C-alpha cells in the first residue's frame, strides 16, 4: 500500500488533483475526489474534459506501475520510504505516453469519479492500456480511453 501511495506522490499533477488509489476485488481502482475547482462547465455543471483526460491517463500509468513495474523492479525498504523531497524512487522514469484516445460518453457530474485500467499488452518497451471511468454506477461509464506507452528502462 505504501508503494501505491508513492506512485501517486511521484506524479505532481495527480497529487494536485487529489487522486488516490485503492484495491477493490483484487483490482486497482483510481479515485478522483470531487472538488468545485474541477468543474469546466458551471452551467451544467460538468467536470472539465481535461481533468477527465488527465484522470484516465494517470489511471493507466498507475496500472502500469502496479501491474508491471512494481513486480519487475526491486525496491529496497529505504527506497519505499522516500518522498519527492528526498529523491524519487523512480528516478524520473515513468511510462511515456505515445498516444491516448478518450471517448467522452456523458458529462462527468459534480461527484467523485472512479477508474479502472486493464493492461492489454506489456512488453519491455511498449504497453497498451484500456481505462474505464464511472461515478456512482460502475455500469454507467462517463468516459473510456485507450493508450499506448513507452516503458522506462530499469537498467538506467
Regions found by a protein language model. Give the residues of each.
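Terminal targeting signals and extreme-terminal segments of soluble enzymes
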Residues: 1-156
Amino acid at each position: 500500500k505504501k508503494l501505491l501511495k508513492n506512485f501517486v506522490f511521484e506524479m505532481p499533477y495527480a497529487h494536485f488533483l487529489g487522486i488516490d488509489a485503492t484495491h477493490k476485488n483484487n483490482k486497482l481502482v483510481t479515485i478522483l475526489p470531487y472538488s468545485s475547482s474541477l468543474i469546466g462547465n458551471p452551467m451544467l455543471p460538468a467536470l472539465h474534459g481535461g481533468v477527465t483526460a488527465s484522470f484516465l491517463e494517470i489511471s493507466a500509468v498507475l496500472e502500469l506501475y502496479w501491474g508491471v513495474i512494481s513486480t519487475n523492479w526491486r525496491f529496497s525498504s529505504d527506497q519505499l520510504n522516500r518522498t519527492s523531497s528526498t529523491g524519487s524512487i523512480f528516478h524520473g522514469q515513468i511510462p511515456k505516453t505515445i498516444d491516448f484516445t478518450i471517448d467522452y460518453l456523458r458529462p462527468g457530474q459534480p461527484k467523485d469519479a472512479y477508474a479502472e485500467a486493464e493492461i492489454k499488452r506489456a512488453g519491455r518497451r511498449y504497453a497498451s492500456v484500456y481505462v474505464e471511468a464511472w461515478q456512482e454506477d460502475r455500469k454507467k461509464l462517463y468516459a473510456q480511453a485507450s493508450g499506448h506507452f513507452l516503458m522506462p528502462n530499469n537498467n538506467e
